[in-house]
From Swiss-Prot:
Keyword terms, alphabetized: Repeat, Ubl conjugation pathway, WD repeat
Species: Drosophila grimshawi (Hawaiian fruit fly)
GO terms, molecular function: ubiquitin binding
Family statement: Belongs to the WD repeat WDR48 family.
The protein, known as: WD repeat-containing protein 48 homolog
GO biological process: double-strand break repair via homologous recombination
Segments of this protein annotated with the region Disordered: 591-615
SUPFAM superfamilies: WD40 repeat-like
Length: 667
């Protein structure tokens, strides 16, 4: 017996997985942040599809993809390169901060200090210090050299915290020397700390909405802020006041980039415009470009002649800056004339994000429509893309493929990352509620006359964790074989599987194939909820769901004395032909087989062949079932009849009668 030890015992857990390709070379959703390594021209992009990608900006080829960095399972909100480009720090909506080997692309360690979405990072290059902040109102300071030295045995890290924030923090900035740190929040104010002492030095008021982006001057004397109120403000920290308010956007300002001399601002807005503005003379401005969607992030290209921009869409574009020569953004160039910008210098194409999803009635397939209006069918059970239908009419295809069958919901679909994430749990939707016949597209059993029922949730969990070996501390039972998987199918080995708290933090993320590893096996043993180990390790069978229903003669029956209304209970997936068999054998032959009329009678034992006596015709060709004045298809199961025909909260009621040329004696 597996003794399941878990620190998550009191937490309600869920399991999720992503249906995707083994390698996703394109962003599948918006891109939240950019970082360029000037040493090698590598551009790092933080995606809302939970993936950080690396691009070669020095190549003229359209194929700029180098690699993906995957370990987050929600939006990556911010990234910073540190240690001269050797390492990268990332912040995510999965509430974690991760430390990466930037060159090799693997996650070195995960920091779980935050309790909510981590929205922003700030980096002090001269001190190798990183700050993180998010919706939990907390700001933490990290020593990068300590973070990059963490190992499995040396995994203790200390952090300093900056307290005093009263609302969710959306922006954060530090100067290179690490003498000033500034935060912006939904409190609509800027808070300033000295990170060396963790003491708050001041707060600045002036914005009327959330402060979305911040930049601190290298000397720590000035701060530039962009807000959802549509303004850009320049603050003098020595004077503790706003010295300039710039109105160049019609909607919120979400991204800022400064010239080296801190005299020019490049701003990106929700209004889709990217604009260059001179701080001392805001009327001296020039539109760089109008993007196709709200601008999320900006970053210089390698020679600073252009600016990389990301938006709600998945493309990353580089736009030529409008300037006479590069000195206008470096030395000032007050007398230089603007030249027209807006030329697209390069584009890294992204993929389509799924925007709509419908779960079909069979509760196995889902149909999606993406941002390019392309329709795709996915097989949730096998965790694969089944069919690409192209840009066809979505609603018509859903209607065409939906069958009149009712199977309980056993999973939910999350489209936040732009890819289909399937969620299994035990809360509002029970992942073990879907019992179906083996005919649901799975291999036939050895005996075709045997009716086998399968549980979708059980089969899927067994496939997702097929490579999980129980801990060695469990004494093996030599009398029982080591059973792995579900015996019917396997799922793609590259599938990411995530264990997380319901509505909360991620506890464990791994690929299907990685569950065989010793460390992953131990982690699963510590974190997997009991309802998962019950079916995957203990091989327990989920309980059947039952439906009570009434059975009575149809008014057209020729024997009015048979007016008794029997109440029965059966598994909800029993087909109506079994009810016909019960009527034929247990009700109409009451004189010879006095077993009908029991109020607690179940159909579990009514499995005999209706052809064995009296006629070679099956029961459904001799008995007719009615519900709500509708003849019931004998292939329908009880839950489908209740959902599509009965449509009432009261117990399902059937009426039966003999078909033509058949009497009570079965002749």
């Amino acid at each position: 017996m597996l003794t399941h030890k878990t620190c998550q015992a009191r937490k309600k857990m869920q399991v999720s997985f992503v249906i995707r390709d083994a390698e996703e070379k394109q962003h599948r959703n918006g891109v939240n942040a950019l970082q360029l390594d000037p040493n090698n021209g590598k551009l790092y992009s933080a995606g809302r599809d939970a993936i950080i990608r690396v691009w070669n900006t020095r190549t003229e080829s359209n194929e700029k993809y180098i690699q993906s960095m995957e370990h987050h399972n929600d939006w990556v909100n911010d990234i910073v390169l540190c240690c001269n480009g050797r390492n990268l720090i990332s912040a995510s909506c999965d509430t974690t901060v991760k430390v990466w080997n930037a060159h090799k692309g693997f996650c070195m360690s995960t920091l779980r200090t935050h309790r909510d979405y981590v929205q922003a990072l700030a980096y002090a290059k001269d001190r190798e210090q990183v700050a993180s902040a998010g919706l939990d109102k907390a700001i933490f300071l990290w020593d990068v050299n300590t973070l990059t030295a963490l190992t499995a045995s040396n995994n203790t890290v200390t952090t300093s915290s900056l307290t005093g924030s009263k609302d969710s923090i959306y922006s954060l900035a530090m100067n290179p020397s690490g003498t000033v740190i500034v935060s912006g929040s939904t409190e609509n104010i800027l808070r300033i700390w000295d990170p060396r002492t963790c003491m708050r030095s001041m707060k600045l008021r002036g914005h009327t909405e959330n402060v979305r982006c911040l930049v601190v001057s290298p000397d720590g004397n000035q701060v530039v802020s962009g807000s959802s109120d549509g303004t850009i403000k320049v603050w003098n920290l020595g004077q503790q006041r706003c010295i300039q308010t710039i109105h160049v956007h019609k909607e919120g300002v979400w991204s800022l980039l400064m010239s080296e001399n801190f005299q020019y601002i490049i701003s990106g807005s929700r209004d889709r415009n990217i604009i260059v503005t001179e701080i001392r003379n805001p009327s001296n401005k020039m539109l760089v470009c109008e993007e196709k969607a709200p601008v999320l992030s900006l970053g210089y290209n390698i020679d600073k002649t252009g600016v990389w921009a990301t938006t709600w869409n998945s493309d990353i574009r580089c736009w030529k800056l409008p300037m006479y020569d590069r000195c206008i953004l470096t030395s000032g160039g007050m007398d230089a004339q603007w030249t027209l910008g807006g030329t697209e210098m390069a584009c890294i194409r992204g993929g389509a994000a799924i925007k709509e999803c419908t779960v079909l009635n069979d509760k196995r397939y889902i149909i999606t429509k993406d941002s390019q209006d392309k329709v795709v069918v996915y097989d949730v059970l096998r965790v694969i893309k089944k069919e690409e239908l192209g840009p066809i009419e979505y609603e018509k295809e859903v209607m065409k493929r939906n069958k009149q069958v009712y199977i309980p919901n056993w999973f939910t679909v999350d489209l936040k990352t732009g890819m289909p994430t399937i969620v299994l749990g035990q809360e509002e939707v029970d992942c073990f509620s879907a019992w179906v016949s083996i005919e649901a597209g799975l291999p036939e059993c050895d005996d075709p006359t045997t009716e086998i029922k399968i549980n979708y949730g059980k089969l899927l969990l067994e496939a997702l964790l097929e490579y999980w070996t129980p801990p060695h501390s469990i004494p093996p039972n030599e009398m029982e074989p080591d059973v792995r998987g579900n015996g019917y199918f396997q799922v793609p080995k590259h599938t990411p599987v995530i264990f997380s708290e319901v509505g909360g933090r991620t506890v464990c993320r791994l690929l299907v194939r990685d569950a065989a590893g010793d460390s992953e096996s131990t982690l699963l043993h510590e974190t997997a909820p009991q309802w998962v180990t019950d079916v995957v390790i203990e091989r327990n069978i989920p309980k059947f769901l039952k439906i009570p229903f009434f059975l009575q003669p149809h008014p057209q029956m020729t024997k009015p004395e048979r007016s008794k209304k029997d109440r029965l209970v059966a598994n909800e997936f029993i087909q109506c032909r079994k009810v016909c068999e019960h009527v034929l054998e247990k009700v109409l032959n009451t004189e010879t087989t006095p077993s009908g009329g029991n109020a607690n009678n179940s159909l579990q034992n009514s499995q005999s062949d209706a052809n064995s006596e009296g006629s070679q015709l099956p029961a459904e060709e001799r008995i007719e079932l009615w519900c709500n004045d509708v003849v019931v298809d004998p292939n329908m199961d009880l839950r489908t009849v209740r959902h599509f025909i009965w449509k009432q909260s009261t117990d399902l009621t059937f009426q039966y009668k003999a078909k033509q040329n058949f009497n009570f004696d079965g002749k």
